[in-house]
Amino acid sequence: MTEAAALIILAGALVIGLGAIGAAIGVALLGGKFLEGAARQPELLPMLRTQFFVVMGLVDAIPMIGVGIGMYILFALGA
């Protein structure tokens, strides 16, 4: 394996791994703020829950895009 091929594999792994770590941190912060808001104003719980799930879905879409780009890097460029 050449050095360039090894760096391409490393780049693909970093895209997938760091995207997943970033999304996990984002969902954790989002969940904490959701619980704070729900505890502070329980009457707003339905609105907060809807916004929470919409934003959580958007945050979770980022690692899926990263997986697609990482797989492209690994299989299309790494071959």
From Swiss-Prot:
Provide this UniProt record's keywords sorted from A to Z.
Answer: ATP synthesis, Cell inner membrane, Cell membrane, CF(0), Hydrogen ion transport, Ion transport, Lipid-binding, Membrane, Transmembrane, Transmembrane helix, Transport
Is Transmembrane helix among the key words of this record?
yes
Compartments in which it is found: Cell inner membrane
GO MF: lipid binding; proton-transporting ATP synthase activity, rotational mechanism
Extract the InterPro entries matched here.
Answer: ATP_synth_csu_bac/chlpt, ATP_synth_F0_csu, ATP_synth_F0_csu_DDCD_BS, ATP_synth_F0_csu_sf, ATPase_proteolipid_c-like_dom, F/V-ATP_Csub_sf
Pfam families attached to this UniProt entry: ATP-synt_C (PF00137)
For this protein, the record's CDD domains field holds: ATP-synt_Fo_c_ATPE
Which SUPFAM superfamilies does the UniProt record give? F1F0 ATP synthase subunit C
Quaternary structure, per UniProt, is:
F-type ATPases have 2 components, F(1) - the catalytic core - and F(0) - the membrane proton channel. F(1) has five subunits: alpha(3), beta(3), gamma(1), delta(1), epsilon(1). F(0) has three main subunits: a(1), b(2) and c(10-14). The alpha and beta chains form an alternating ring which encloses part of the gamma chain. F(1) is attached to F(0) by a central stalk formed by the gamma and epsilon chains, while a peripheral stalk is formed by the delta and b chains.
Write out the similarity annotation.
Belongs to the ATPase C chain family.
Function of this protein? F(1)F(0) ATP synthase produces ATP from ADP in the presence of a proton or sodium gradient. F-type ATPases consist of two structural domains, F(1) containing the extramembraneous catalytic core and F(0) containing the membrane proton channel, linked together by a central stalk and a peripheral stalk. During catalysis, ATP synthesis in the catalytic domain of F(1) is coupled via a rotary mechanism of the central stalk subunits to proton translocation. Key component of the F(0) channel; it plays a direct role in translocation across the membrane. A homomeric c-ring of between 10-14 subunits forms the central stalk rotor element with the F(1) delta and epsilon subunits.
What this protein is called in its record is ATP synthase subunit c
Q: Which organism is it from?
A: Cellvibrio japonicus (strain Ueda107)
